[in-house]
Design a protein with these regions (language model features):
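Catalytic core of non-heme Fe(II) oxygenases with the double-stranded beta-helix
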Residues: 56-140, 145-150, 156-161, 172
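Catalytic core of Fe(II)/2-oxoglutarate
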Residues: 118-198, 202-205, 212-226
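Intrinsic disorder/low-structure terminal segments
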Residues: 8, 17, 42, 79-82, ...
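Proline-rich intrinsically disordered, low-complexity coils
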Residues: 25, 39, 48, 52, ...
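Secondary-structure transition/capping residues
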Residues: 34-38, 91, 173
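Non-heme Fe(II)/2-oxoglutarate
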Residues: 1-69, 108-111
Length: 227
């Protein structure tokens, strides 16, 4: 991870439940707003409209005061972040003495910030001024979009967030084929059998239909892949 964070742990999306129920509808919405296209970098030699996506990286972050995640981008096609617990309010962070000589809109304490270039090449940013109203909210964005998590202050509680990356399944073997460490996924034959039973169906128009399978989502404290 790029972050200077206290703790991060990998998660398992059992039966691809979160991927199907949360991620695929957002992928479909993105495609419908972008002429059926994904935000693909030009070095990807695959057809995005016939190559399935997979949630191959999923992890939870525990951020404490002064922890931060500098500007970075992720691998894959799409990324997301979900704020599960936010112990601070941006308005309260703005009142801290070290920020009083800074224009209020430029006070970044406790914010999540995107950075991008506009049509003229200028560097622009968009900040989420986080507080408890953002708990259980999700941002879903192109993996190549630069973003940062700024530090917060004045509390010993952790901010808890979940993040993940969606990649193309270029092997046809699901997460097993894409995994950097396939041994983490257990028995190959059993995994591929389960994947086939839970496979989503592609309709040829940019959408994947959801399979009817048992809906479970478990957390396992394993080391996440680097981004």
């Amino acid at each position: 991870l790029a972050g200077n964070l206290t703790a991060s742990f990998g998660l398992d999306d059992d039966n691809d439940f979160f991927y199907r129920e949360a991620c695929l509808p957002l992928v479909n919405a993105f495609r419908q707003s972008n002429n059926g296209s994904d935000p693909v970098r030009n070095f990807v030699q695959t057809d995005p409209m016939t190559t399935p996506l997979l949630l191959t990286e999923l992890w939870v972050n525990y951020q404490y005061q002064t922890d931060f995640n500098p500007f970075h981008f992720h691998g894959g096609v799409y990324s997301f972040a979900i704020w599960m617990k936010i112990p601070t309010e941006w308005e309260d962070q703005c009142k801290l003495p070290q920020f009083q000589d800074i224009k209020k809109d430029n006070r970044k304490a406790g914010t999540f910030e995107f950075q991008y270039t506009d049509a003229l090449g200028g560097i622009r940013s968009m900040s989420y001024q986080l507080g408890k109203s953002f708990e259980n909210c999700m941002v879903f964005f192109p993996a190549s979009l630069m973003h940062a998590v700024h530090p917060f202050y004045g509390t010993d509680e952790a901010r808890v967030s979940i993040a993940g990356n969606l990649w193309y399944d270029t092997t046809g073997k699901g997460r097993y084929g894409n995994a950097l460490d396939p041994e983490q996924l257990g028995d190959k034959d059993e995994y591929l059998k389960t994947m086939e039973a839970n496979r989503t169906e592609y309709d040829g128009g940019g959408n994947y239909t959801k399979a009817e399978t048992e809906k479970t989502f478990k957390v396992k404290p394993k080391k996440p892949k680097k981004t």
